Amino acid sequence: MKRSAFFISDGTGITAETLGQSLLAQFENITFSKFTRPYIDSVEKARAMVQQINKAAETDGFRPIIFDTIVNQDIREILATSNGFMIDIFSTFLAPLEQELTEHSSYTVGKSHSIGHNSNYMERIEAVNFALDNDDGARTHYYDKADLILVGVSRCGKTPTCLYMAMQFGIRAANYPLTEDDMERLQLPAALRAHQHKLFGLTIDPDRLTAIRNERKPNSRYSSYAQCEFEVREVENLFRRENIPHINSTHFSVEEISAKILVEKGVERRFK
């Protein structure tokens, strides 16, 4: 079964998309076509949005699922005329919370991601810059400032995990790709030895690694199953020999991988 899902907001759409994606992930047997539509902040945009939703409904033969964080009542009423199933994220959770706290919420556009009111903004930017500057072993002389250093074979998910932890939690995470030479020596590169307490390993199933590498360099030694199987086997041997905690990333989302790493290493999030 195929269904369409829209994440609609008069702000950035981050809240609608994040929560909506998490909810849809619980329905593994349904394929969703997902559309994020931020800054739907005028009557004209809302009417155009209704046309998109209705077209998706006609194409799919099912009502699209709509996750929205729209504040403006006029815009919400226009969206409600569409042939979609609407889930108002804020009102769903705020109404019972207001009752419990006996306080009205400041239901304002972009409140949860407002730069002006978010003391974590600079921490987030600095963490992302750190992850980018220290990606793929490009620099190693700033590892003393890292909260974590992810290690593993090429294309096992190190970079997206580092960026996710930076964006979501302000974690300064570097990553270092272990090469064939490192594996044959069965010892950590010199750049990592002084920071072994910060290391966390990522591994991956060889067949999945083969598929990923074939998208980048098809029909090469780098992407061959034999090479991928060798690298995975040897890097896991290295992790065990050096007592480096590690996780197989094959069947986990980047959110799950990040959470497991932070728990295992006991690293505190800079913001929550």
Curated annotation (Swiss-Prot):
UniProt-listed Enzyme Commission number(s): 2.7.11.33, 2.7.4.28
Molecular function in Gene Ontology: ADP binding; ATP binding; phosphotransferase activity, phosphate group as acceptor; protein serine/threonine kinase activity
Reaction equation(s) it catalyzes: [pyruvate, water dikinase] + ADP = [pyruvate, water dikinase]-phosphate + AMP + H(+); [pyruvate, water dikinase]-phosphate + phosphate + H(+) = [pyruvate, water dikinase] + diphosphate
Keyword Isomerase: no
Enzyme class: transferase
Domain of life, source organism: Bacteria
Pfam family of the protein (one): Kinase-PPPase
Residue sites binding ADP per the record: 152-159
Alphabetically ordered keywords of this record: Kinase, Nucleotide-binding, Serine/threonine-protein kinase, Transferase
Function text: Bifunctional serine/threonine kinase and phosphorylase involved in the regulation of the phosphoenolpyruvate synthase (PEPS) by catalyzing its phosphorylation/dephosphorylation.
PANTHER family for this protein: PYRUVATE, PHOSPHATE DIKINASE REGULATORY PROTEIN 1, CHLOROPLASTIC
NCBIfam families for this protein: PRK05339.1
Family as reported in the entry's similarity comment: Belongs to the pyruvate, phosphate/water dikinase regulatory protein family. PSRP subfamily.
Name of this chain's protein: Putative phosphoenolpyruvate synthase regulatory protein
